[in-house]
Curated annotation (Swiss-Prot):
Keywords: NAD, Oxidoreductase. Belongs to the Gfo/Idh/MocA family. Disulfide bonds: none annotated. This is Inositol 2-dehydrogenase. It catalyses: myo-inositol + NAD(+) = scyllo-inosose + NADH + H(+). GO terms for biological process: inositol catabolic process. It holds the Pfam family GFO_IDH_MocA.
Length: 343
């Protein structure tokens, strides 16, 4: 392996451009070796000012570019399966943004392909596991100081939804973060989901079922509820409260400034997930680069990506039917160990 890990970045949109900046100026030990995006001009703009970066419009060309030793996938979800399989065929370690693959059948194909390799190559970008507040909550729950977790209360609010955002995407794009966070925090698989749909907000685009209230059941008997509101109009908020047998703990309130002035006080609200979770993204990519340079894969696994896809699909069915839906996972390959919820 070279002195600097050569990374091919697939996708040069909002997320891809942010990762290109991160690899170039924030994370040590890596460099952007190649970028692929169907819109070549967008890729060229994302790497402007960087030396030695090869720009391509095809995934295969970027993966085969000189100096490429690892892959960061930040393209739209439907392109992920092909890119992951191409990386596997070349033996390249991958950090893949969520969703790993949008549908559970495709996600299972990734799990099975990696299992046939007999070694992990893929890490999925569930960045909340790298957020300082979430890491502190995980450590506290694992310590047992508050007793057994009984419930998680989660809040997920966005300023507004982008064009083309559908009611199903509230579950499989937004709540997918809470799906993985709940599995990781509790160390339990989610076994059933119910979705309640209040009257849509006046701020929601016509036809969008926003907000929604999602209730998950877990294998260990805990409950997880999620309020998802993607057209709040005021900011990006993510909160989580764990209610345990001997106490409770809440995160998500303390990451912005509290301003006091004449007549009162107010707290600023982040406007974008890249602002709220900037440090988490930095930590995630830094740890991935360091582990890859050691020949290891340590973060959320392809199994985690598959499980999130299965739960999200059950959530969309519950949203459509109004019924409680159970979650059925395929048998877990031995590659992912006795404790399937990694990191």
């Amino acid at each position: 392996m070279s002195q600097l890990l050569g990374v091919a970045v697939l996708g040069a949109g909002h997320m891809g451009a942010d990762h290109i900046r991160r690899l170039d100026s924030v994370v040590s030990g890596a460099r952007v070796a190649a970028v692929a995006d169907p819109a070549k001009e967008r890729a060229e703009e994302a790497v402007a000012g960087l030396d030695g970066v090869l720009v391509h419009t095809e995934v295969a060309a970027a993966l085969d570019a000189p100096g490429v030793e690892a892959v960061l996938i930040a393209s739209p979800g439907p392109a992920h399966e092909e890119a992951l399989l191409a990386a596997f065929a070349r033996g390249l370690p991958v950090l893949c943004e969520k969703p790993m693959v949008p549908d559970s059948a495709g996600a299972l194909r990734i799990v099975e392909a990696e299992a046939r390799l007999g070694r992990r190559l893929a890490q999925v970008g569930f960045m909340r596991r790298y957020d300082a507040e979430y890491m502190g909550l995980k450590s506290l729950l694992d310590s047992g100081r508050l007793g057994r977790p009984l419930m998680l209360h989660c809040t997920h609010r966005n300023v507004s939804s982008p064009p083309g955002f559908t009611s199903a995407m509230l579950i499989n794009s937004s709540v997918s973060h809470e799906i993985d966070a709940a599995r990781w925090l509790l160390g339990q698989e989610l076994t059933a989901v119910t979705v309640l749909r209040p009257r849509p907000s006046a701020h929601a685009p016509e036809g969008l079922l926003d907000p929604q209230f999602v209730l998950f059941e877990t294998a260990g008997g805990a409950l997880v509820d999620v309020e998802i509101l993607v057209n709040s109009g005021f900011g990006y908020q993510v909160r989580c409260e764990a209610v345990c047998e001997a106490g409770s703990v809440r995160i998500g309130d303390a990451h912005t400034m509290v301003v006091t002035s004449a007549g009162g006080a107010y707290q600023e609200v982040a406007q974008d997930y890249l602002v709220r979770f900037a440090d988490a993204y930095d930590r995630e990519v830094r740890e991935w680069v360091d582990a890859t340079r050691r020949g290891q894969v340590t973060g959320p696994s392809a199994w985690d990506g598959y499980a999130a896809s299965v739960v999200a699909e059950a959530g969309v069915r519950a949203q459509d039917t109004g019924d409680r839906m159970t979650v059925e996972l395929a048998p877990r390959p031995d590659l992912y160990g006795q404790n399937p919820i990694s990191r």
